[in-house]
Curated annotation (Swiss-Prot):
Gene Ontology MF terms in the entry: serine-type endopeptidase inhibitor activity
Miscellaneous comment: Could be the ortholog of SERPING1.
Positions of disulphide bridges: C97-C396, C104-C179
Coiled coil: none
PROSITE patterns for this protein: SERPIN
Annotated site location: Reactive bond: R434, N435
Region called Disordered, residue ranges: 27-60
Full protein name: Factor XIIa inhibitor
Residues in the signal sequence: 1-23
Family per record: Belongs to the serpin family.
Length: 468
């Protein structure tokens, strides 16, 4: 394994397909997936508290074809033809489809940044809790709440009606959080980079207001795809490979025929350990699972600066290690090998999570005898069943076409942590305390990469097997 901290790359892919929608959407039994009941088709994980197990290992994006049965339309009032009357229906307090806000003052952006940090933290923990339940037990996973939220927030530029309300609720945003796009842009740092791109079929007209707002706020304008599906597939996969530094070389093997709109977001981590580990001290040691132990390469340091404490509520130790560019690597690990990560996950409420992070940020770094494994984590999940706004989406601000519906969402992530750091000699200037602290990571643990400036998790996950 190369001795370096390789860029962590993530990709969130959103496909939208066109199916004729004339009125209320009704899913016919003939269009359900094998083993799925009619009631299952309308479930969503985060909004209503119910979750559906997705096929997390599927190599291609699932496409849900909907058979739409027109509903009978009746007028709310019956009036004689000879006596026309004025409508008694009052206009709504706000427009059905809000125009994108592309200008915010500095004070508005600063205020939005504080709100966004809190919202991303709430969103992150709810996603983690859903993943920890739906993923197979004792398996690794990693995701970027920042990447997922960035793409869903970009959709907000063109969302209207209930779709907009549902998205804001899902992301823990206040209603009409118009300066969120500027706040997201302000969250960019040298430690990680976010890329967005929209591809669409040539027959789908994108509104100029959306294209202009997307370019100004996210740095990309929608790009049309040609009629050659092979060339379109190559164009998309090339974009993915380039933006993820070849960590994800081929996301899609084929493009569904009815795909009309593809939204992509990739996040690449360039931060490294602020203080490198000595590769000469890395040795093979046991990593304890529930009923066995495996041998893995363990990085060791007798005087590594760690901010750590044992939380009374969780009764579990937590530690924070410094990365470059104002980022931290936070670890929550069971207290002993007799305790299990699942118990920690169940006890980690939003209030407890925020309290732990706050305590770790307030705790000073001390020279610590640190033992932790090299890490290699890869994860892929189909996000379609996590969100319930997607079943009848309103993208009136993005296109005039009412037929566009979401058919697939996929998220991919990889992480590899080794000894390499920004300053390979900095460890030599750390003095050894008389009472040396001990922080050992030799069993399954929860981790997150924390942005110290804006107070939110960029990445989050768990490790059961450090070898991946």
């Amino acid at each position: 394994m190369a001795s370096r901290l390789t860029p962590l790359t993530l990709l969130l892919l959103l496909l939208l397909a066109g199916d004729r929608v004339t009125s209320d959407m009704i899913v016919g039994p003939g269009n359900l997936q094998e083993g799925e009941s009619e009631g299952d088709s309308q479930k969503g994980g985060i909004l209503d508290g119910e979750s559906i197990q997705g096929n997390e290992d599927s190599p291609t994006l699932p496409i849900t074809n909907l058979t739409v049965v027109p509903a009978t339309v009746t007028k709310p009032f019956s009036q004689p033809a000879t006596e026309p009357v004025q409508s008694t229906i009052q206009p709504t307090a706000e427009p059905f489809c809000l125009a994108p806000v592309t200008s915010c003052s500095d004070s508005e952006i600063r205020s939005a940044e504080a709100v966004l940090g809190e919202a991303l933290t709430d969103f992150s923990l709810r996603l983690y809790q859903d993943f920890s339940v739906l993923k197979k037990r004792e398996t690794n996973f990693i995701f970027s709440p920042f990447s997922i939220a960035s793409l869903l927030t970009q959709i907000l530029l063109g969302a209207g009606g209930e779709t907009r309300v549902s998205l804001e609720h899902l992301l823990s945003y206040p209603q009409n959080f118009s300066c969120v796009h500027h706040a997201l842009r302000a969250f960019m740092s040298e430690g990680f980079t976010s890329f967005s791109q929209i591809f669409h079929s040539s027959d789908l007209t994108i509104k100029d207001t959306f294209a202009e707002a997307s370019q100004r706020l996210y740095g990309s304008s929608p790009r049309p795809l040609g009629n050659d599906s092979t060339a379109s597939l190559e164009l998309i996969n090339d974009w993915v490979a380039k933006k993820t530094n070849l960590r994800i070389r081929r996301l899609l093997d084929s493009l569904p025929e009815d795909t009309r709109l593809i939204l992509l977001n990739a996040v690449a981590l360039s931060a490294k350990w602020k203080i490198a580990f000595d590769k000469g001290r890395t040795s093979t040691k046991p990593f304890h699972l529930k009923s066995s132990a495996i041998k893995v390469p363990m990085m060791n340091s007798k005087k590594y600066p760690v901010a750590s404490f044992t939380d009374r509520t969780l009764n579990r130790p937590g530690g924070r290690l410094q990365l470059s560019h104002n980022l931290s690597f936070v670890i929550l690990v069971p207290q002993t090998v007799k305790h299990h990560l699942q118990d920690l996950e169940q006890a980690l409420s939003t209030a407890v999570f925020k309290a732990v992070i706050k305590k770790l940020e307030m705790t000073k770094f001390h020279p610590t005898h640190l033992t932790m494994p090299r890490i290699k984590v890869q994860s892929s999940q189909d996000m379609l069943d996590y969100f319930d706004f997607i079943y009848d989406v309103n993208l009136c601000g993005l296109t005039e076409d009412p037929d566009v519906q979401v058919s697939g969402i996929r998220h991919q992530a990889t992480l590899e942590l080794t000894e390499s750091g920004v300053d390979a000699t900095a460890a030599s200037v750390v003095s050894v305390a008389r009472n040396l602290l001990l922080f050992e990571v030799q069993q399954p643990f929860l981790f997150l990469l924390w942005d110290q400036q804006h107070k939110f998790p960029v990445f989050m996950g768990r490790v059961y097997d450090p070898k991946g």
